[in-house]
Each structure stands twice: as structure tokens, then as C-alpha cells.
Amino acid sequence: MASKNSASLALFFALNILFFTLTAGTNCRCNPSPKPRPLPNPKVPSPKVPTPSVPSPYVPTPSVPSPSVPTPSVPSPSVPSPNPTPVIPPRTPGSSGNCPIDALRLGVCANVLSGLLNVQLGQPSPQPCCSLIQGLVDLDAAVCLCTALRANVLGINLNVPISLSVLLNVCNRRLPSNFQCA
């Protein structure tokens, strides 16, 4: 027991010496002297000195009538613009492979997919899911459903290519050839 007390006492003195050594080594004054307050300087307005105004002398200009000469009208030549605007062909809607639908709205397709895989009792209606992708080209519909499946918006971890083709078949859509849901 005496060894524990002596070890605790030795640790106390070691920390005490370390503390006072570090505080003394910082060369910090304990009582900083207060800063003297500056005396307020009253603002004295500067006197306004009027600027002398000197009138400019009047110089009369002789009035000479100008001869009346008709000016011929010359048509200005049309200059072609240096940078012609390129003609951009009109974009066909749906051929871009972009999804114009918010992927979170495709969560209604989860009921269709889970009902087809016998995860849910009863037959869910594919109408809400199919109505979302109804106006899209097959490529855009595939891109939208692929995005929803990859982001796991549907909440089901499945084989993405099989799930994609199942959802498209339910809505009477075709998976475009050479389309890969990457």
C-alpha cells in the first residue's frame, strides 16, 4: 500500500513541477497593465473659404449662312455576317436516352415487380407504373426504369437486366436492341 501512495505522490510532484515549469517558461506577465484611454479629440470644423468666381468673357461668333447643298443618298452595302449561325437539326423527342421522369416517382413500379415475383399477395395493377412511361420512347422508358433499379428506388435487390425486361414486358414495351443497363 505504501508503494501505491509513494507512486501517486511522485506522479503528483512530477506533474506539479511540469506545470510550473511550463507556465514560468512562457514569460507571461500575470497582471497586464491596462491600456491608457485615448483622449477624445473634439472635431473642429474647418472654415469654408469661398472660391472666387471669375466670369468668362463673352466672344461673339459671326453668323455666316451656310450654302444649301443637297446631300446625295447613297445606299449602304449589306455586309454578310462574319460568323454564320450553324443550322441545328431538330431533335426528335425521346431519342436521347435521357430520363425525363424523376426516378423517385418510379417507386410505384415496385408493387408491380414485387407482385410479379410473388412477394406480395394479390395482383397489383401495373397501371400506375405503365402510365408513367406511357408517353416515352422505348429507349427512354428503359433508361428510366434502369435508373430506378440501379438506384434501388424500388427497394428490391434483384438482377437488374431481368427486372428491367419484366417491367417493360408488363407495360407492353420492348427492350431496345443492344441496350445494356450499366
Swiss-Prot record:
Location, primary (coarse class): secreted
Sequence repeats: 42-46, 47-51, 52-56, 62-66, 67-71, 72-76, 77-81
Gene3D superfamilies per record: Plant lipid-transfer and hydrophobic proteins
Keyword terms of this UniProt record: Cell wall, Plant defense, Repeat, Secreted, Signal
Signal sequence bounds: 1-25
Reported phenotype of the disruption mutant: Reduced cutin accumulation due to lower cutin biosynthesis. Early flowering in long-day conditions.
Superkingdom, taxonomy of origin: Eukaryota
Ranges of Pro residues composition bias in the record: 33-92
Gene Ontology, cellular component aspect: chloroplast outer membrane; endoplasmic reticulum; extracellular region; plasmodesma
Cellular localization per UniProt: Secreted, Cell wall
GO biological process, any: defense response to fungus
InterPro entries documented for this protein: Bifun_inhib/LTP/seed_sf (IPR036312), Bifunc_inhib/LTP/seed_store (IPR016140), Hydrophob_seed_dom (IPR027923), Plant_LTP/defense-related (IPR051636)
SMART domains xref list: AAI
Pfam families the UniProt entry points to: Hydrophob_seed (PF14547)
Region described as 7 X 5 AA repeats of P-[KS]-V-P-[ST]: spans on this chain: 42-81
Residue numbers spanned by region Disordered: 33-94
Induction data: Transient accumulation in response to a brief exposures to cold.
Family: Belongs to the plant LTP family. PEARLI1 subfamily.
The protein's role, per its UniProt record: Probable lipid transfer protein (LTP). May improve freezing survival. Seems to control the flowering process and lignin synthesis. Confers resistance to Botrytis cinerea.
Name of the protein described by the UniProt record: pEARLI1-like lipid transfer protein 2
